[in-house]
Amino acid sequence: MKHILVTGAGGFVGSRILQQLSGRFAVTSLPSGFLRETTQDDLLARLEQEHPDVILHPAAVSDVGYCEHHPEESHRANVLLPLWVAEAARRTGAKLLAFSSDQVYTGMAGEQPFDETARLSPANVYGRHKLEGEERVLGLLPEAVLLRATWMYDLLGYGLPIRGNLPL
């Protein structure tokens, strides 16, 4: 059975990933708060000890306003931690899927969705840090997969009104 390690499993995206994969794979996560306090050496040691086949890295500081007011925390979470996770993946031979953001783009130039050739021009600290994180991860681990996700939301459990689903 494949061993998958999920970072940020207590967060919005990570908790849903953990829920979906549990029971189908051997899934582990890091303790809550571990990434906020860890050093590069401690993170590398922990991930080498876990020795996963796959690392899913959705952990981030994603509140755009918070990142503007706390750029040092944003840099650590969105640039350094992904780089450290990529180093652990490189050392252990794990596959890496790291989450980035559509905030690396400047805006929609028409009705087409973004692709790999779209202009990158982040307009805020969060977007700049996510782009720098992407570049540093791919510089170290070119085979890593980076997912530029858009705004993630869920209705249940987050106080958002349920308006119903429309069938396709």
Model-identified regions with their sequence ranges:
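SDR active-site strand-loop-helix element
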Residues: T7, I55-A59, L96-D102, L147-A149
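N-terminal Rossmann NAD(P)H-binding glycine-rich loop of SDR-like oxidoreductase domains
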Residues: K2-S22
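Glycine-rich NAD(P)-binding loop of the Rossmann-fold in SDR/ketoreductase-type enzymes
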Residues: H69, E73-W84, L120, N124, ...
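NAD(P)H-binding glycine-rich loop region in Rossmannoid oxidoreductase-like domains
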Residues: T38-A77, A88-R90
